[in-house]
């Protein structure tokens, strides 16, 4: 398996490690999203402590307005963070 394919499998696995703990296994609730960000993105993003921050992140990601983050919305978030990191490291 190529490095890109391994990364794709890892993204799917991480999403499903957190989704469905509290309901729909194909979507992240706010608490699941907060836990995922704090556990899996701690080197790129600050720890989320305030509920308002979680609410704002979810509002930004939740394109269909259902109050949860599906895999497509999660991938859009990963792409945004990855792009920001790439731009940051590109200038170093």
Curated annotation (Swiss-Prot):
Residues reported to bind Ca(2+) 2: 62, 64, 66, 68, 73
Record Pfam families: EF-hand_1 (PF00036), S_100 (PF01023)
Record InterPro entries: EF-hand-dom_pair, EF_Hand_1_Ca_BS, EF_hand_dom, S100-B, S100/CaBP7/8-like_CS, S100_Ca-bd_sub
Positions of the EF-hand domain: 13-48, 49-84
One cellular component (GO) term of this entry: ciliary basal body
Residues that hold Ca(2+) 1 according to the record: 19, 22, 24
Subcellular location: Cytoplasm; Nucleus; Secreted
Gene Ontology MF terms in the entry: calcium ion binding; calcium-dependent protein binding; protein homodimerization activity; RAGE receptor binding; S100 protein binding; tau protein binding; zinc ion binding
PROSITE patterns, A to Z: EF_HAND_1, EF_HAND_2, S100_CABP
SUPFAM superfamilies linked: EF-hand
Post-translational modification N-acetylserine, affected residues: 2
Entry keywords, A to Z: Acetylation, Calcium, Cell adhesion, Cytoplasm, Metal-binding, Nucleus, Repeat, Secreted, Zinc
One GO-annotated biological process of the protein: sympathetic neuron projection extension
Positions bound to Zn(2+): 16, 26, 86, 91
SMART domains in the record: EFh, S_100
Subunit structure: Dimer of either two alpha chains, or two beta chains, or one alpha and one beta chain. The S100B dimer binds two molecules of STK38. Interacts with CACYBP in a calcium-dependent manner. Interacts with ATAD3A; this interaction probably occurs in the cytosol prior to ATAD3A mitochondrial targeting. Interacts with S100A6. The S100B dimer interacts with two molecules of CAPZA1. Interacts with AGER. Interacts with PPP5C (via TPR repeats); the interaction is calcium-dependent and modulates PPP5C activity. Interacts with TPPP; this interaction inhibits TPPP dimerization.
Task performed by this protein: Small zinc- and- and calcium-binding protein that is highly expressed in astrocytes and constitutes one of the most abundant soluble proteins in brain. Weakly binds calcium but binds zinc very tightly-distinct binding sites with different affinities exist for both ions on each monomer. Physiological concentrations of potassium ion antagonize the binding of both divalent cations, especially affecting high-affinity calcium-binding sites. Acts as a neurotrophic factor that promotes astrocytosis and axonal proliferation.
Protein name: Protein S100-B
Gene label: S100b
